[in-house]
Structure formats: C-alpha cells, structure tokens
C-alpha cells in the first residue's frame, strides 16, 4: 500500500504524526512548493537545461505525480528520517529512486519554506529584523546544544576544529525559540 496525500489528508492524527503539520498548515505549503519547483524544473527545458523538443508529460507517469505527493514525500523524510529503502517502500519507489527524489526535493522544500518566511535565520545580524517581520513580542528562550563528533584524521581539519582543551570534540549550536509560539527564530551555524 502506497502512502498518498489524498487518503492521508482525511486522517488528522496520521498527517500530524508523519509530517509534523496540521491540515491547515499543510494547505498553505503546496502553492509555495509548486512555485519553488517551477523555478528548478521549468516545463520547457529538459533535465540537463536544454530546450525541450517534445511536449512535457510523455512517458511513464511517476509515483510522485502531484505537487502534494512530492511535498508529502519530502516532509515525511524530514520528520522521520527513515532509511531510504523504507521510504521507497512506503511511497512505491526503489531505494535509488528515493535517494534521487530526496536530493532533488529537499532544496525545493527549503526554498518554499524560506519564501513563506518560516525558516529560522542563521545570520546573527539579521535576527532582530527577522523577528520584527513576524510582529510578535514575546519571551525568547536561548539554548545551546552540543553534539559529539569523531575527531578528524586530517591534521589541517584537526587544527580548525580543536579548542586546545583536552575534552571530546563536538559541534555547538545556539537556538533562540519564541516561548509562546515555540517557533525557532535563530539557529546558529554549526
């Protein structure tokens, strides 16, 4: 059984569990996703960028035929991070095809979310204007995260990553979250 948006949209709990979005939030996203997809994949050009000689739409129809299905595929991947083989099984694709769709759709999803203005800023100087754009004045929670990572083998990379202290090497992030809406406003570079 293939996971399809038309069946999933009727089940509020499953949609939220698989995508992290409510129906109302999901309805807003396809138009922005469609616009971002059209900039990456215009209908009058082929995959390599040359002008199309034949009309678009010929050939076998893909499993991810609609914009909503492509969006659902990328949101399920982002929310659950399953193995690509499992994701392929859920959507009726092979593992290699699932990998290709992931590589193709994630930048489009990021662009669509950025166009809607819901991505957190990653530049500290732009945080204040970014928050003023949302017209909300609320308490902000500032938190730091630290994730251990393996020590690089390359001496040049070791020097860049090392703080000089004898402790495990780790990546650090600072996160600023609006306490009322739980919206991430700022996420530092890793």
Task: Go through each PLM region and give its residues.
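Structural motif
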Residues: 60-68, 163
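Short, well-ordered secondary-structure "scaffold" segments embedded in the functional core
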Residues: 83-190
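Short, amphipathic alpha-helical "recognition" segments used to contact nucleic acids or chromatin
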Residues: 66-82
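Short secondary-structure transition/capping motifs
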Residues: 18, 62-65, 75-76, 91-94
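Short helix-loop boundary/capping segments at the starts of domains
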Residues: 31, 35-42, 79-82, 107, ...
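Short, charged beta->alpha transition segments
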Residues: 56-61, 74, 126-129, 172
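Charged, often Cys/His-bearing segments associated with DNA-binding zinc-finger transcription factors
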Residues: 1-62
């Amino acid at each position: 059984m293939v996971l399809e948006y038309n069946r999933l949209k009727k089940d509020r709990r499953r949609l939220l569990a698989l995508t992290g979005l409510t129906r109302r939030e999901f309805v807003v996203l396809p138009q922005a996703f469609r616009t971002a997809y059209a900039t990456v994949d215009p209908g009058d050009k082929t995959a390599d960028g040359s002008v199309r000689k034949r009309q678009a739409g010929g050939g076998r129809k893909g499993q991810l035929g609609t914009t909503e299905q492509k969006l659902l595929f990328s949101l399920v991947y982002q929310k659950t991070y399953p193995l690509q083989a499992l994701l392929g099984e859920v959507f009726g694709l092979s593992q290699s095809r699932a990998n290709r769709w992931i590589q193709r759709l994630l930048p489009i999803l990021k662009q669509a979310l950025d166009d809607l203005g819901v991505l957190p800023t990653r530049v500290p100087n732009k945080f204040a204007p970014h928050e003023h754009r949302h017209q909300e004045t609320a308490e902000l929670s500032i938190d730091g995260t630290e994730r251990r990572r393996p020590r690089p083998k390359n001496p040049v990379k070791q020097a860049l990553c090392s703080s000089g202290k004898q402790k495990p090497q780790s990546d650090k992030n600072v996160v600023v979250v609006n306490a009322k809406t739980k919206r991430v406003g700022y996420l530092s570079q890793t």
